[in-house]
Amino acid sequence: MSKEPLDEIQWKNPEWIQQFGLFTGNVLDYFSESPFYDRTSNNQVLRMQFQFQQIPPNINPQKYLQSKLVEMTGIEFIIAASREPDFWIIRKQTRLSPKQVNIEQDYYIIGANIYQAPKVYDILSSRLLSSVLSIKGSMELLNKMSKFNIHDMGHSYPTLQAEKEISSSSNTIPNTVSVNTTTPMLHTPATASNINSNGHSSTNLGLNNEISNLAFDNLLNNVINSSNDDTYLEDIPLYGKGSTVESLGVKVNLDDV
């Protein structure tokens, strides 16, 4: 007998059906050939007895078998439902008394194939697992779509077209690193060539982004290496000679402050 789980087995015996046919009168005999059958059941006990005693004439064999099973206790197989010529439900149950049984398992026969009916627990587990996997995939997709930028103070959700443009632009940028060696104190005066249409100097656009990390490092090192232990970064004036603005090389119009 196969060690494969019974709820994953599809069993059939075309040779048996070709020899005996398949109908309600012999469907239990056909089922007894399958790995789902319990050979310690009351059905097997009665089959052994019927080999040595004659079934009364003019009595349906299935009804006679059913009447004998009612008189016994233990595991038994009965036909729970039938729809000839291609569908039957076989039920495995434990009989405690002539009127009391505990249902153990159902099997169904479709054509020549026999299957074990799945339990409700297995069905719900499978459906829940499928749902959880779908939700997990959706969450992963949402995480890929969302991008957090500290400068924007939140998440952004670029469109598919924007993603394609970013991807194409990243593929065209060479894998080289350029270092900005421009002196932080350097200031380019505004001329007619670098004035935009709105009247603002192009060198002042994005000024905060042009301040290099080197300028901040120099400012911090001046405080750390100072011989005066009472000097702190917040003690340095913001404007004027020796101020933070001067150290960073930022030109500020004090009239706008």
Swiss-Prot record:
Gene3D superfamilies: Mediator complex, subunit Med6. One of its GO terms (cellular component) is core mediator complex. Keywords: Activator, Nucleus, Transcription, Transcription regulation. One of its GO terms (biological process) is positive regulation of transcription initiation by RNA polymerase II. One of its GO terms (molecular function) is transcription coactivator activity. It comes from the Eukaryota. It is found in: Nucleus. Signal peptide: none annotated. The keyword Protein transport does not apply. PANTHER family: MED-6-RELATED. Component of the Mediator complex. Belongs to the Mediator complex subunit 6 family. Component of the Mediator complex, a coactivator involved in the regulated transcription of nearly all RNA polymerase II-dependent genes. Mediator functions as a bridge to convey information from gene-specific regulatory proteins to the basal RNA polymerase II transcription machinery. Mediator is recruited to promoters by direct interactions with regulatory proteins and serves as a scaffold for the assembly of a functional preinitiation complex with RNA polymerase II and the general transcription factors. This is Mediator of RNA polymerase II transcription subunit 6.
